[in-house]
């Protein structure tokens, strides 16, 4: 898999552990060469009767993958120990150059804690969505070619020290 990636990111938060104000934005794209444009194969009928021929469709994976992530932090009062609202929006899209040569790799695996790193398919990106089982929002047969995740958190610091930061939070989250 040969790909070229570009990322544009900006972070204006005031603290990396417990941000009280600012924002964090990133937009990225990963592109592979459109190998099927340089090939004389007709992928609409390619590999219909031959397993080895069908498997060779994925010798050179081609896709374009777009992602956008945004977080904003807003303090509700002044001072060091103040409640903070964090809002989040993110989406991703895995596209293809040839509709008969969709990539089964680099898909999105959505739902769950996002910490296990386990998915049922190879080379999937795990997208956490609290309150759901791991992977439960990726429809079977759709392979997770797109996702959207929206959320908000209300955070309250319990202890903010140089060596330890502890805070309580309530959240609402949704996605597909």
State each model region's role.
Residues 172-176:
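C-terminal beta-signal and adjacent terminal beta-strands/loops
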Residues 164-166, 170:
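Generic long, charged, amphipathic alpha-helical segments
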Residues 1-158, 170-171:
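C-terminal outer-membrane beta-barrel translocator/porin domains of Gram-negative envelope proteins
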């Amino acid at each position: 898999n040969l790909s070229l990636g570009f990322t544009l990111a900006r972070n204006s938060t005031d603290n990396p552990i417990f941000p009280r104000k600012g924002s964090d934005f990133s937009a990225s794209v990963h592109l592979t060469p459109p190998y099927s444009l340089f090939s004389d194969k007709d992928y609409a009928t390619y590999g219909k009767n031959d397993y080895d021929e069908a498997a060779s469709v994925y010798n050179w994976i081609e896709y374009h993958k777009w992602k956008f992530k945004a977080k904003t932090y807003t303090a509700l009062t002044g001072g060091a120990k103040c409640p903070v609202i964090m809002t989040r929006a993110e989406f991703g899209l895995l596209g293809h150059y040839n509709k008969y040569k969709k990539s089964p790799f680099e898909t999105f695996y959505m739902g769950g804690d996002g910490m296990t790193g386990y998915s049922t398919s190879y080379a999937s990106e795990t997208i956490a969505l609290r309150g759901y089982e791991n992977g439960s929002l990726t429809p079977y047969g759709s392979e997770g070619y797109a996702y959207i995740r929206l959320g908000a958190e209300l955070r309250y610091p319990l202890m903010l020290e140089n060596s330890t930061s502890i805070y309580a939070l309530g959240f609402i989250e949704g996605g597909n």
